Amino acid sequence: MKTALKLWSLTFLLSSTVLSGQELKQASFSADQAARGSELYQQNCAACHLANLTGSFEAPNLADTGFRSNWANRRVDEFVDMLQRTMPPQAPGSLDQSQYLDISAFLLEANNISASATALSLSAGSVLFLDNKAGAARVLERRTPVPGLAGTVPSPGTRNSVPEIATIYQSERARTRSFESVNKFRNVSNEELANPPAADWTYWRRSPQSQGYSPLDQITTDNVGQLSLAWVWGMEPGRSQPAPLVRDGIIFIPNFGNVVQALDGRSGNLLWEYRRQFPEGGRSGGLLRTLAMWEDLVYVATTDAHLVALDARSGAVRWDSEIADEALGYSNTSGPIVADGIVINGISGCGRFFEQSCFITGHDAATGAELWRTYTVARPGEPGGDTWGDLPLEFRGGADVWMTGSWDPEMDLVFFGVAQAKPWMSVSRGMSADDAALYSNSTLAIDPSDGRIVWYRQHVPGESLDMDEAFEQVLVDIVGEPYLFTIGKSGILWKLDRRSGEFQGLRETTYQNVFSDINLETGEVRYREDIRNMQVGEWLSVCPSTAGGHNWQSTGYHPPSRNLIIPLSQSCMEMSPREIEFEVGSGGNQGDRQWMPMPGTEERFGKLAAYDVDSMEEEWAIQQRAPFLTAALTTAGGLVFIGDYDRYVHAYDVETGQELWRTRLATSAQGFPVSFAIDGEQYIAIPSGREGGSPWRIGSFLAPELQSPNNHNALYVFKLSP
């Protein structure tokens, strides 16, 4: 077996040893260095760590006691070396050493270290934060973990020329440029959202049931080899996992940086572009995954915790509602859904300790007015409020809603997955694995009219390894009976009765060693004992890793074959909990990780498998070295389309798994493929991008011979050759 390549980011810690016989001194820096570093930080770091350094998602706070404690008496050269190897995530090592030193100087200033006349350098004995109580300087001892043991210019063919005049719409936080009138767009009714026309893709997974299935059948198993490129559109650089929407041949696609574009689906011409403008000192940039539409509006949940309605024909802002305070870390990573005239959105960025926990909101689709708010953290004195140990409300972190939900129009229920409690590991959050922490790691069934939780199913109570169950809820009727299928990072496929949430079955899809007991009759799981008894600073080796199992790359359902097609990831990790301070504004993920190959897979990190919805049996599986980084798109032509880290897009026979066609893109295929039709001609659209979270990192960390070039985000559109 090849030796696993191990890389570390700001959140990663390894065991440490003491460097003795060396006089420690606080690193110095100049004011000029800090000023340059501030500008570099805003350009390269603020999208993840935020302008105020408080951090978001997996990016830690860089100006709190946890950061200072972590780097106390650790050498400046060690810190700069780590930055050079891992930052910025989309292009590690892209800055020169002096620029990394400038950023380090800015971080010192932000942590109340005063500037001096002496510039920051890599001199021996100079430590990032001097702490006389912490002992001698520490250096990292790299350990070999053992699984299972404790311890843009338009592309040719898109826009023909830059228009001389564009109509400009300016709002308080956005500017829209409209180049062409979108006259052929027809309003999208409630009835069409419930049952979309075959030619359109009006939900993030086409239908409100989140099946990712297109009923178009012009492209088949017999002719898919004749697919050719129709056009390409170059997208904004940055972390990108977009899910386009299509109506009447108009593509609406989210970009990094809170940019939304409308494209002509036949030619690739840009029709209008909405670009978010962020106030000074606030969040900038950020990932957008999904959009929603209703009537003549397109809805965007922005990374500064706003919900925005755009005019579908012009891109002009119709309304803009703040749903949370971005200064507290709140954000949106995925978009809302619309259910019968109500826009329903889940908030994320809830890792910090504040009383205002995560929630799901319902809004009037026409005005943006908030109709209801349902918290995903059970409050003291309410049902489930006693499942958080003795923690007061302000220290109940997590339960983010970071993926988009589903809607059953007949039952009039919406379904959302809720992520894990935070910090990731139970001992870090002052709890045990027996503290369920409702409603984290659950599927929620919600009445869209008032936000009432009709039922919930907590898949892994007391989840303690950042293996959340926050992903797609696929709604399937089997012989007239309504079911819900969902799968999380543990790789367990869950089957529920969607009327009640009652457990109906499960299937393990990848190797796992975190649960010592899985009750096949009830679905109850129990962690192995060393996980239940974890201690701060001790390492646990677990499978799968936080990449999954399964992650954001959504399942596709193929009704004719009754198969669920699931993108899976095969890797393991070693993980260690940190100690945190229980102070308002503290918190975060507070766990350290190293990734490694999964035993028995021959270092094939990507898996695509089909599961029969009746028996839950695996029908076929494909394993390869490159991780799969798109959702699965299934079609009535008997095909499943999917893309991977190694830049390939594949078309497989949905019933056998036989590969029938593939092509290669400029960078990793990443996001949510869609299919649509214009004048009876079927198209397949595949996004490319980088920085898909843990699933993308598996390729960059463990398969270094596979390359994912930077700055090639795009939308590739294919059709049959004439």
Language-model regions, residue ranges each:
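Flexible coil segments in periplasmic/lumen-exposed cytochrome c-class electron-transfer proteins
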Residues: 92-206
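Repeat-blade elements of multi-bladed beta-propeller folds
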Residues: 201-205, 237-259, 282-306, 331-354, ...
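Electrostatic cytochrome c docking/interface patches
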Residues: 21-40
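Short, conserved, GDST-rich strand-edge loop motifs in beta-rich repeat architectures
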Residues: 345-358, 416-437, 539, 570-601, ...
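Blade/loop signatures of beta-propeller domains
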Residues: 161-229, 376-383, 525-531, 597-598, ...
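The canonical Cys-X-X-Cys-His
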Residues: 37-52, 103, 107
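Extracytoplasmic beta-rich repeat domains
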Residues: 232-245, 273-294, 320-335, 375-404, ...
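Extracytoplasmic electron-transfer domains, predominantly the class I c-type cytochrome c fold
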Residues: 56-57, 61-114, 150, 201, ...
